[in-house]
């Protein structure tokens, strides 16, 4: 035990208790009021001395102040003027203040102004009231007294500051606290503030010397007392139970020094071995706690615990340990507040909550970053060790065996621990990101993550990504504008997968920026407006593997391209590669949304990013234009519902005829794809192209070829006849078709285009011309088939007109004209016009009014042409005889005349009326077209008979004529008795059937039959008949 030096005359018990000015003392005698206590030399004061002291100690007069004073009226005036100005200024500024403030807020501000002004007047009022209590209302006394108080207060304050500076200067003094306090007591009071027990404190060697009648305390007695107290304390410590935390103690100076490392040191003492311990001094063993606890209150609580408990030291440790933990937790709370408000974590990067009841602090860091803000730090008391610990709650750190999760010795080291935790957390995030293969490690700076970002199609450059350890946000070193746009997205990522996805989008946008820049420099136009609801489906980005891939569709075109047609670049990016697919498509806008109207899914080209160069982009302008034209035609054909197929290059070279590729065929030149790179072929189904016309099935081959020559800007449609047609033998330069020399049956239609937007119009033009050609060929074929004779001849052949002759004895230039009426797209109608001199011209109204097929018209004209020629001959002969007999009419008055009238009810029934007004008879001969069955075959025949409407009796003059026709023409052939035939024999007639009441014959026999009947009916009439023609009626067939 080490001893301490005390002032002479002080007992050991007093020395043990001198550490506190207001400490409770077990044995304390009253201090006598001697002269030595107040520092007087004379032991006794006389009456004269007292009177003299009273006279000399009378208070001096208060210094009078005459400067810096003004009348009270001036003060009241100035205060009134100030009040008026403040109120008026408030009224003016209230009008221009924020209108969003409520009326209650404005009223509260005005009320605060009034209270402030009222307080100023109230101070002045109170001052006046105080001054009235002074004799004669002398204000100067009040002013002088206030000035004296200020001066005195300044002196006292200076002394206090001097003492504080002295106390700070003695902080590092090597004297014990007890001796230091005793020295200060001696310095300020002239003696220690301890009970003397009637001893005079002195350091002289004379033990029996008296001072003012009191003996000095001997030094040996003081030392002996301290030794006795040490023995008493040692015996008492040994006789009671102490906790293991109190094993580190030291007994000296009459007290026991108990030290708990890292927590506190407490000094206890006692009077004897039967008395309990009492508090002497307490000291915390960590810095910054001088102003955090109240030592007098702690002394009272500790003495109460030592007095009342059976195991005082156990209870004392439990109390002080809990007190220290609470104090340490509160100190950590204050330190965290300082770090959050004014320290390195200011700005909301660190937030904590302090729960004093649960002795718990929960911290959350990296509040501005989403990736690591879900972890937290907990500071509290460990249940096992009952020590203050800091626990880092992080799932990834728990799996790592090399990172601490629990920290002790937290007090004073909070900032360092937080720095270590944030550094370890950044290492975890960095290791997680490196394991995904997206980043690379920087050898120079381990805290940097390198991400390879393309700068061109062939080169990449690393960008440096770091984590700010204070805020937890990611940032790029030397960022570009594009990187700055993605920093906020990176910091909003909540998982490493999200962060990787953001970086992949960054890489994809950089690739898009590079490609767009290359296309812009070479004259392309990149559309930034088109946004599809669903991305283009690709072969790379399928459903099975699309989770790790990102896609962006670019729509690029040239200004000269057809409207709405684009080169679509589909960029599919992954962690390690980038694939670009090229397609041709047509994009339209409907109802405010972009939609793909046509997309080429067959000729999809896939390229790597490294293979794209400026040379290839320039070559795309020509090759893509060719494909655009192809797909424009394909799209147009699809709209026309025409089945089509694009011919592959191999098919073009190896399988197709050479005349489809070259105008002048040269067998010596070998086929190669390079020779025909400027030519594309599309096969077309003929029937769908001509909208299902059946007339072409026997004329043209079912497959046609549409050829595009991009070098000559020419479009051709190739076709082929199935067989040689009669149209080939006709001279027609206006057909606008070109025949192939080496393929007699092959032909083509050709047009030259200058505007790409008008290519679709050529399909309509080709379809119109082709339909016109088919119809024209079919008409010519049917004409030759129906009018197959030596006297049939096509006079003129034009695309819309066919003129021909088919009558045997025709003297006109043409007998019939067929006009093909077309509109802008298709064949509308066919019209048949008979010439005016044509014997069949009488049926023209029926042809015009009824919509007959031209095949029926041709067959009808051919079948009835002998009939109408015969009728014309009968009428012309009668007309000639009429002119000859007109001259003899006056001389021969006894002649009778028979008139012949031709009438048409419809195209299947005609009548010849023989009328003789002199003899008073009328004979009607009916000619009908009927379908009959001959030997099981149905044929069209003429049926000639007399009308049943006219009742001719035997007395009529016409009866002999009718009877003769029936007997000689209509009746079956019978022989007379002498063996001669009883009927007239019809020469050159075949297929004649006598029916008794009439006769049936074909077109070849109708002339002979009709001429024989006409001869009989005119046989008895010696006069020329009067011939008239009745206009046809509107009856239908």
UniProtKB/Swiss-Prot annotation:
GO terms for cellular component: core mediator complex; mediator complex. One of its GO terms (molecular function) is transcription coregulator activity. This is Mediator of RNA polymerase II transcription subunit 14. The keyword Transcription regulation applies. The gene is RGR1. Keywords: Activator, Nucleus, Transcription, Transcription regulation. It is found in: Nucleus. Component of the Mediator complex, a coactivator involved in the regulated transcription of nearly all RNA polymerase II-dependent genes. Mediator functions as a bridge to convey information from gene-specific regulatory proteins to the basal RNA polymerase II transcription machinery. Mediator is recruited to promoters by direct interactions with regulatory proteins and serves as a scaffold for the assembly of a functional preinitiation complex with RNA polymerase II and the general transcription factors. One of its GO terms (biological process) is positive regulation of transcription initiation by RNA polymerase II. The lineage of its organism: Eukaryota, Fungi, Dikarya, Ascomycota, Saccharomycotina.
């Amino acid at each position: 035990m080490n001893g301490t030096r005390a002032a002479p005359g002080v007992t050991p018990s007093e020395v043990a208790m001198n550490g506190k000015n207001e400490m409770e003392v077990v044995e304390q005698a009253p201090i006598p009021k001697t002269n030595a206590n107040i520092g007087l030399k004379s032991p006794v004061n006389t009456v004269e001395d007292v009177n003299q002291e009273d006279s000399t100690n009378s208070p001096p007069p208060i210094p009078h102040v005459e400067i810096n004073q003004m009348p009270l009226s001036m003060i009241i005036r100035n205060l009134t003027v100030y009040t008026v100005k403040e109120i008026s200024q408030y009224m003016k500024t209230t009008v221009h203040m924020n209108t969003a403030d409520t009326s209650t807020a404005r009223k509260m501000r005005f009320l605060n102004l009034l209270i402030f002004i009222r307080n100023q007047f109230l101070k002045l009022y109170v001052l006046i009231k105080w001054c009235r209590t002074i004799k004669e209302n002398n204000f100067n006394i009040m002013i002088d007294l206030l000035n004296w108080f200020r001066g005195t207060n300044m002196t006292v304050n200076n002394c206090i500051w001097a003492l504080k500076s002295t106390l700070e200067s003695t902080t590092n003094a090597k004297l014990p606290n007890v001796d230091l306090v005793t020295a200060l007591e001696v310095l300020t009071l002239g003696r220690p503030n301890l009970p003397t027990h009637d001893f005079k404190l002195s350091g002289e060697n004379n033990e029996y010397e008296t001072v003012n009648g009191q003996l000095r305390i001997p030094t040996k007695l003081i030392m002996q007392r301290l030794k006795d107290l040490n023995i008493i304390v040692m015996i008492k410590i040994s006789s009671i139970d102490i906790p293991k935390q109190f094993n580190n103690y030291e007994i000296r100076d009459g007290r026991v020094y108990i030290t708990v490392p890292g927590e506190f040191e407490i000094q206890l003492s006692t009077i004897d071995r039967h008395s309990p311990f009492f508090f002497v001094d307490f000291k915390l063993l960590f810095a910054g706690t001088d102003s955090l606890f109240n030592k007098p209150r702690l002394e009272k609580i500790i003495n109460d615990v030592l007095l009342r408990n059976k195991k005082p030291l156990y209870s004392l440790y439990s109390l002080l340990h809990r007190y220290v933990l609470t104090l340490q937790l509160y100190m950590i709370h204050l330190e965290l507040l300082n770090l959050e408000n004014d320290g390195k974590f200011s700005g909301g990067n660190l937030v904590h909550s302090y729960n004093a009841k649960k002795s718990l602090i929960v911290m959350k860091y990296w509040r501005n970053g989403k990736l690591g803000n879900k972890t937290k730090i907990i500071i509290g008391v460990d249940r096992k060790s009952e020590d203050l610990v800091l626990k880092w709650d992080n799932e990834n750190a728990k799996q790592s065996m090399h990172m601490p999760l629990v920290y002790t010795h937290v007090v004073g080291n909070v900032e360092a621990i937080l720095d270590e935790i944030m550094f370890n957390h950044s290492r975890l995030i960095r290791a997680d990101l490196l394991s995904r293969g997206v980043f690379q490690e920087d050898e120079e700076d381990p805290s940097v993550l390198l991400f390879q970002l393309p700068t061109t199609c062939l080169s990449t450059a690393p960008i440096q990504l770091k984590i700010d350890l204070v805020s937890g946000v990611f940032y790029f070193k030397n960022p570009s504008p594009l990187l700055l746009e993605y920093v906020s997205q990176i910091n909003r990522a909540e998982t490493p997968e999200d962060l990787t996805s953001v970086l992949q989008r960054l890489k994809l946008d950089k690739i898009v920026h590079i490609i767009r820049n290359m296309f812009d420099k070479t004259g392309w136009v990149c559309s930034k407006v088109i946004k599809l609801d669903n991305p283009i489906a690709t072969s790379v980005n399928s459903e099975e593997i699309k989770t790790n891939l990102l896609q962006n569709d670019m729509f690029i075109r040239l200004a000269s391209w057809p409207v709405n047609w684009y080169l679509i670049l589909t960029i599919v990016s992954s962690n390690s590669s980038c694939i670009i697919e090229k397609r041709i498509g047509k994009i339209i806008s409907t109802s405010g949304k972009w939609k793909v109207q046509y997309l080429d899914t067959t000729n999809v080209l896939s390229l790597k990013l490294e293979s794209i160069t400026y040379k290839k982009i320039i070559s795309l302008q020509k090759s893509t234009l060719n494909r655009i034209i192809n797909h424009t035609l394909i799209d147009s054909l699809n709209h026309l519902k025409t089945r089509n197929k694009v011919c592959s290059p191999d098919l073009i070279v190896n399988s197709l005829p050479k005349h489809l590729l070259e105008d002048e065929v040269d067998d010596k030149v070998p086929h190669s794809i390079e020779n025909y790179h400027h030519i594309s072929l599309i096969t077309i189904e003929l029937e769908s192209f001509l909208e299902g016309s059946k007339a072409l099935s026997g004329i043209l081959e079912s497959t046609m070829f549409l050829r595009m020559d991009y070098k000559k800007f020419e479009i051709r449609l190739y076709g082929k006849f199935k067989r040689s047609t009669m149209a080939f033998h006709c001279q027609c330069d206006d057909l606008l078709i070109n025949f192939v020399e080496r393929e007699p049956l092959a032909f083509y239609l050709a047009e030259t285009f200058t505007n790409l937007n008008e290519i679709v119009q050529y399909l309509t033009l080709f379809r119109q011309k082709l339909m016109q050609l088919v119809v024209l060929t079919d008409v010519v074929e049917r004409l030759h088939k129906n009018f197959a004779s030596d006297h049939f001849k096509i006079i003129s052949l034009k695309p819309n007109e066919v003129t021909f002759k088919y009558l045997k004895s025709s003297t006109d230039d043409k007998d019939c004209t067929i006009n093909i009426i077309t509109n802008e797209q298709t064949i509308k109608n066919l019209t048949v016009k008979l010439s005016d001199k044509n014997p069949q011209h009488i049926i023209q109204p029926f042809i015009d009014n009824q919509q007959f097929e031209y095949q029926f018209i041709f067959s009808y004209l051919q079948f009835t042409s002998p009939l109408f020629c015969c009728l014309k001959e009968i009428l012309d002969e009668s007309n000639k005889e009429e002119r000859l007999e007109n001259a003899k009419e006056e001389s021969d008055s006894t002649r009778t005349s028979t008139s012949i009238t031709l009438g048409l009810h419809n195209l299947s029934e005609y009548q010849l009326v023989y009328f003789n007004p002199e003899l008073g008879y009328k004979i009607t001969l009916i000619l009908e077209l009927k379908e009959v069955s001959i030997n099981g075959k149905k044929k069209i025949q003429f049926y000639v008979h007399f009308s049943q409407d006219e009742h001719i009796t035997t007395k009529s003059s016409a009866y002999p004529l009718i009877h003769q026709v029936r007997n000689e023409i209509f009746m079956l052939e019978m022989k007379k008795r002498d063996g001669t035939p009883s009927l007239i024999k019809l020469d050159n007639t075949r297929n004649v059937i006598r029916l008794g009441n009439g006769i049936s014959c074909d077109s070849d026999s109708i002339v002979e039959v009709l001429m024989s009947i006409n001869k009989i009916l005119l046989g008895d009439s010696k006069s020329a008949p009067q011939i008239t023609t009745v206009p046809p009626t509107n009856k239908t067939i």
